[in-house]
Amino acid sequence: CIQTLGHLMKTLRWGYANDMKDDPDVLLIDEEKTYVFIEAMIKKWRTLCKTDKIHIGMDEAEGVGLGEYFNRHGYCDRYEIMLRHVQRVNDIAAKYGFKPMMWSDMFFKIGSKKRDYYDLNAEILPSLSEKIPTDASLVYWDYYHHDVELYKTMLKKHKEFGRNIIFAGGAWLWRGLCPHYDKTFDTTLKALSACDDEQIKSVIATMWGDDGGEVSRYTMLLGLQLFADYSHCDKLNVENTKENFKLCTGYDADAFIALDFDNIQAKKKDALATSKQVFYQDVLLGLFDKNFAEYDLEGYYDGIIDKLGALSNQGDIEYLFEYYRYLAKILKKKCHIGVKIRRAYNANDIDELLKCADVLSELSDDYKEFYKKLCSVWNRENKLFGFEVFEERIGGMLMRFKSCGEKIIKYCRAETERIDELDEEILWYGDENSKGELLSEHFYNNMRVF
């Protein structure tokens, strides 16, 4: 699975790509250097694998035709531009013996007045859809919806292209620090029910690694079992999948479900990143503290600790459960520390502030130990590349624990008149509709104030 149009910002930022990018994230269509680049990728993959299947991507290329392409050619029909590109890439794939599949969203977005993939009123012109190569499969990706009828309607609209249709659903582990089984089960059961009704023969389970890929792939084995069951079960249900999971792996399905820390009964259905927000938010700036204060998160994480503590040794994956037991203890200790610090500061409660400073010192030690456990999990499952992201993030947290603790102690000793961060009013995270809610924000950069 590669990208041959968008999602290429990390490589297009380098100088070699200056002549072949439409915008910072999207390749420049009709530029010959673009196709030399794409052919080099596909040729390399031909030497690395035996399969005849290749996913050529092309999703979320929102800027296609609107950047350097526009500068060179003026505004052109973006559908026509896309189709020319698809044909060129398809021909390259065929040259190396591959049968390509591609994401379908750009065809819907271009045909939607709202530029919305899931716009049921998007116009797909037969005269254009007929130009999609007949041997290219279209992949409908949808990880979000909880409505069988919506999935069925979208599948029917895909069939209008007259090409082989594949469905890609989500085995959710790309938000927060934990797998998301509640979301996975509900979306997948409904999506695959629709696929069954619409006679879709091929499905894909995606496990994206957004924002660093913090969650172990092995925590989502049970989700993969649910997708696997689609190939041989008449009707899917979670209880049957649990039995099949035990049969196939020997593992306890309920133990895996217990790792879903973020299945908090909040007003917002997709409050999926609380663990990550708690772990990374600054203890004095309190970006999420006003939202967190509405919930007994300490009690919630205490329940998680009890639940995981009651699980017997999980054999060769016990290392994962040891990691999550430790994470739960950190989250319990840290979830309301910012609220407590601010409350004590506003009340000029010096004794309580000093206790909070001690907690920050404890958290510093806890994060150092957590780093060791995270390193162990990562090295079991991944190459080393990418782990530097967590070293930088956790290293930054350690420096802030030290700095914030020192500020509190200096204030308590009357060595300074104020703590500037605590003199500022904290706000609700999000918009007016987010008051009192836990939120799904999961990007690290959006957990920083500056």
PLM features: residue spans?
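Secreted glycan hydrolases and related glycan-binding modules that recognize and/or cleave
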Residues: 2-5, 14-17, 169-171, 247-249
